[in-house]
């Protein structure tokens, strides 16, 4: 049984005759007839009955028509997926993240990616920035999301968004912080930051805001354990 035989069979069934089917398939009628006969021999059943107006499906032909259409659809789908894989549009995208991008940036990216490449899948996992860079260079992962990546040979990075930086405070600093209208108003307020892990880090960025603008560090720096 060949794929072209299935196509010929479906064409004859839909056209209701060999002549019309041959025209639609752009072949002469004798080769079409021979292929249908060969298909009937392979199946071991007659698929068409000749009538005054053309041909009609036999009981076996009606059953086989549904299967033939499904087989052809499967072949077409497999061909499309293989072509997509060859173009890099299917398979699994290994995505890693660190920090707040998991809340909005990563979900938005995954939705857009899957809408563009419906035959692909995305595996998402958490990974520190240092581990991300190592995994990207070794080919273990495909793409990483985070903040403040250091310049690394062999890895390309882009700024894809910004985040608003907020200040939270409790007694005895809440009144002073709530009245602050600029970064300079916070110079003497102790800051509690994430530990300085992978460099550059979020803590480095916050401290640099003060140092770059005012040539002065905040009034005090405290860090809390990442396990808290």
Curated annotation (Swiss-Prot):
Keywords: Aromatic hydrocarbons catabolism, Cytoplasm, DNA-binding, Plasmid, Transcription, Transcription regulation. One of its GO terms (molecular function) is DNA binding. Pfam families: HTH_1, LysR_substrate. GO terms for cellular component: cytoplasm; protein-DNA complex. InterPro entries: LysR_subst-bd, Tscrpt_reg_HTH_LysR, WH-like_DNA-bd_sf, WH_DNA-bd_sf. It is found in: Cytoplasm. Residues 18-37 bind DNA. GO terms for biological process: catabolic process. Coiled coil: none annotated. Residues 1-58 form the HTH lysR-type domain. The keyword DNA-binding applies. Does not seem to be involved in the regulation of 3-chlorocatechol degradation. Does not activate the expression of its presumed target operon, tfdCDEF. PANTHER family: HTH-TYPE TRANSCRIPTIONAL REGULATOR CYNR, TRANSCRIPTIONAL DUAL REGULATOR HCAR-RELATED. Belongs to the LysR transcriptional regulatory family. This is HTH-type transcriptional regulator TfdT. It comes from Cupriavidus pinatubonensis (strain JMP 134 / LMG 1197). The lineage of its organism: Bacteria, Pseudomonadati, Pseudomonadota, Betaproteobacteria, Burkholderiales. The gene is tfdT.
């Amino acid at each position: 049984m060949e794929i072209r035989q299935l196509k010929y069979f479906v064409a004859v069934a839909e056209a209701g005759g060999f002549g019309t089917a041959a025209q639609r398939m752009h072949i002469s009628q004798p080769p079409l007839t021979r292929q249908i006969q060969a298909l009937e021999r392979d199946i071991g059943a007659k698929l068409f009955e000749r009538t005054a107006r053309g041909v009609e499906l036999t009981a076996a032909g009606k059953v086989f028509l549904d299967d033939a259409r499904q087989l052809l659809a499967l072949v077409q789908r497999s061909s499309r997926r293989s072509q997509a894989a060859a173009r890099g549009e299917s398979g699994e995208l290994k995505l890693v993240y660190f920090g707040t991008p998991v809340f909005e940036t990563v979900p938005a990216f995954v939705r857009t990616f899957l809408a563009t490449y419906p035959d692909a899948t995305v595996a998402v996992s958490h990974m520190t920035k240092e581990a991300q860079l190592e995994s990207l260079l070794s080919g273990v992962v495909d793409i990483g999301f985070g903040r403040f990546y250091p310049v690394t040979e062999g890895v390309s990075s882009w700024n894809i968004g910004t985040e608003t930086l907020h200040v939270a405070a409790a007694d005895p600093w809440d009144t002073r912080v709530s009245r602050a209208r600029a970064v300079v108003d916070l110079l003497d307020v102790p800051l509690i930051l994430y530990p300085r892990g992978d460099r550059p880090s979020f803590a480095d960025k916050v401290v640099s805001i003060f140092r770059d603008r005012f040539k002065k560090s905040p009034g005090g720096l405290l860090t809390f354990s990442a396990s808290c």
